[in-house]
A protein has these predicted regions:
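N-terminal helix-turn-helix DNA-binding core of bacterial DNA-binding proteins
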Residues: 10-13, 19-53, 79-86
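Short, charged/polar, Gly/Pro-enriched secondary-structure boundary elements
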Residues: 87-91
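Base-recognition residues in the alpha-helical recognition helix of bacterial helix-turn-helix
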Residues: 25, 58-60, 77
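A common structural junction motif
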Residues: 98-99
Length: 99
């Protein structure tokens, strides 16, 4: 299996779950605690939006991060998540060429 195929498989696994797709959609929007799209969404905003516990959000974010679809940065006590638009475009391009 080539590196591109392996990356595509990881990305497809990440977006196969409806909760993770909802998280990716939520990351498009600015929420209450979030200061801007450059920073992304605060983990607390993701929790509130998804109505899920912090450990569940961490689990899903870990899978999205491993696939390269989200980026995280820690600022103080908070973790801020944002979409990796380059990786999402790559996913769409690789999916088109794989099928």
């Amino acid at each position: 299996m080539s590196a591109t195929e392996q990356t595509l498989d990881e990305m497809l696994h990440a977006v196969a779950d409806p909760t993770r797709r909802r998280i990716l959609n939520a990351l498009k929007e600015k929420r209450a605690c979030s200061i801007g799209k450059e920073t992304g969404l605060c983990a607390c905003d993701v929790e509130q939006r998804m109505h899920l516990s912090q450990p569940t959000i961490s689990h899903h974010m870990g899978i999205l991060k491993k696939a390269g679809l989200v980026q995280a940065s820690k600022q103080g006590q908070w973790v801020w998540y944002r979409r990796n638009e380059t990786a999402l475009r790559e996913l769409a391009r690789n999916l088109r060429s794989a099928l």
